[in-house]
UniProtKB/Swiss-Prot annotation:
Organism of provenance: Arabidopsis thaliana (Mouse-ear cress)
Residues carrying a glycan: 58, 89, 95, 124, 154, 172, 183, 220, 233, 289, 329, 423, 434, 455, 574, 628, 644, 676
Signal peptide range in chain numbering: 1-25
Species classification: Eukaryota, Viridiplantae, Streptophyta, Embryophyta, Tracheophyta
Ranges in the topological domain labelled Extracellular: 26-739
Protein name in the entry: Receptor-like protein 11
Gene Ontology CC: plasma membrane
Family in the record: Belongs to the RLP family.
One Pfam family this sequence matches: LRR_14
Name of the coding gene: RLP11
Amino acid sequence: MTRSHCYWFYCIITIYFSFLIHSLASPSLHFCRHDQRDGLLKFRDEFPIFESKSSPWNKTTDCCSWDGVTCDDKSGQVISLDLRSTLLNSSLKTNSSLFRLQYLRHLDLSGCNLHGEIPSSLGNLSRLENLELSSNRLVGEIPYSIGNLKQLRNLSLGDNDLIGEIPSSLGNLSLLLDLDLWNNSLVGEVPASIGNLNELRVMSLDRNSLSGSIPISFTNLTKLSEFRIFFNNFTSLPSDLSGFHNLVTFDISANSFSGHFPKFLFSIPSLAWVSMDRNQFSGPIEFANISSSSKLQNLILTRNKLDGSIPESISKFLNLVLLDVAHNNISGPVPRSMSKLVSLRIFGFSNNKLEGEVPSWLWRLSSTMLSHNSFSSFEKIYSKETMIQVLDLSFNSFRGTFPVWICKLKGLHFLDLSNNLFNGSIPLCLRNFNLTGLILGNNKFSGTLPDIFANNTNLQSLDVSGNQLEGKFPKSLINCKGLHFVNVESNKIKDTFPSWLGSLPSLQVLILRSNDFYGPLYHPSMSIGFQGLRIIDISHNGFSGVLPPNFFSSWREMITLVHGSYEYIEDIQNYSLIYRSMEMVNKGVEMSFERIRQDFRAIDFSENRIYGEIPESIGCLEELRLLNLSGNAFTSDIPRVWENLTKLETLDLSRNKLSGQIPQDLGKLSFLSYMNFSHNRLQGPVPRGTQFQRQRCSSFLDNHRLYGLEDICEETHVPNPTSQPSEDLLDEEEKMFNWVAAAIAYGPGVFCGLVIGYIFTSHHHEWFTEKFGRKKIRVTTSAR
């Protein structure tokens, strides 16, 4: 290589590396614009607490490297600010320095605990493509100025406290792909301008208070794939929905839609999830032009007014996995053609009018729920393919002995045969299952309740109430550590109190009422336990003995309320939501609880032979709603610590041997709407609280020393203390009267005795004999 060639070669190399070094160095030295940096720092200072996750925000570092900040590679302008889940704990100011970032394309402040209103100046960020403000505590109306953000692709304002109507200006967002306004308090109708969003893929308006009709312009949104408006008050849909060729999810549940079943909807082959439950659709179920390529997997039509029979055409949905049409008026048999639905796993037709045989192909599903129908028999099982896990056949017309073919359903987890006419014994084959629920109540089963729970370690619910079972209570239940519901009511079980159940940490409901249980509830050798107990009913048995003062002190679930995720005590079995039910005397009336509230706490020890003092530890059960100790032999005073029972609604202490006064502080219990103190030995004034004055007179009968009942009984039950002397005063007066009477009676005799004694001692006895001797002889004779 010549010298000139070398010279040019080195020049080229030098220039190349100079450009390379400059290009690598310049972003770190000159990338962040000062105005952008200063704007971000001022935005940070608007919040009392602002902690970035990793890279702190300060002037000494490049703002483009700050946590959550992204800049344009060329201009250095901030184009993205992602602070999701950063606790800002304040509101967005109208003049916030955030709005100086005019080149922002992406803004995510979701889950930041923002409150206050959305400032209208947000509409000045005209380059925004994604706006995420969901899961905060924002209030007020959606600002009209958001319609200025014409580059917006994603608008997410869900899970806030926004009010007012959806602004019509949202129709200006013609590029919008995703509109998310769920879980707010929006009202009014959807504006017709929403039909301008021709590119929209997802619309989520669920969990608001929107009403009226879905506008006809809605049919313009032909690219829509997800449509969710459940939990609103919409009343009508456009008549033709067949143009949504890309629709996958259609959820309009829990609204006020009425009219005929929208059959043309099901001609859309892409449709996979349809939920129309909890509306007022009526008439028969019909499907128009079902595509052979239909992708429908989930169809939920529960709680409508649908009638007629199950259509044969439903068997064309070969991809169907879940079918739930419960709580309608569907009648007739289950079509045999439905056996073609080989993908079906969940079949729910509870609370209808189906009848005939239960087809055997249902046993290959995972869940079959046919309660509250009129089925009377079972088709013979020909297939060995049994995958059933949840089987609910309650409230039908089955009769005869326990179906032995159930013993072959090896995968069975939950079995409900309650409220039928089954008889005979409960089979031992049930020990081979690992059941989570066994519900056999209200049949005619007899014999013993077999000890079959040694291997059923997952058992959560056991209900054999309302049968004719006898013998011992099964001790193998001690193995069921997850047991939370036990109901053996109205049988003939004869055993001592199963105090060993107190060691089960999850036990919430224990109902032993109306059996032949006997003996004491408390054994000094055993710990009391029952830390998770919420409801106990052991009434109408033969329990006896004394309860120690601390008997209830370990019942933690009645002391402190732990809010659960659900409103009712329930089981979730493969999609199926199964509520627990029971019967109990509440406010003096036998009640049936089809669902048990999570916050309900009750103790019923009535109609037994328990005696001694009422344990003071009851006063610690601050979550207690119902307390019934009637029909026992409790003595002494009513504990005075009960003013802590501020949630108590029902109190029945009738037919005991209680004495003393009714504690005046009970009159302060504002929720106490029913009480019964009758047939005791109570005395003193009735509390003057409003709740006491609203009670019936019979609630205080046969307590002869109670007073202050004039307003309750509308007559003077016992005179008031102003007109009636106290018992102590009466006793003193009676003693004084007795002394006076004695003095009057014995005074003359004593006087005569003294006189006669003086005569004898004064040697005047001859005179005495002369005057009174014959009378003395007469008296002596008479004495004989």
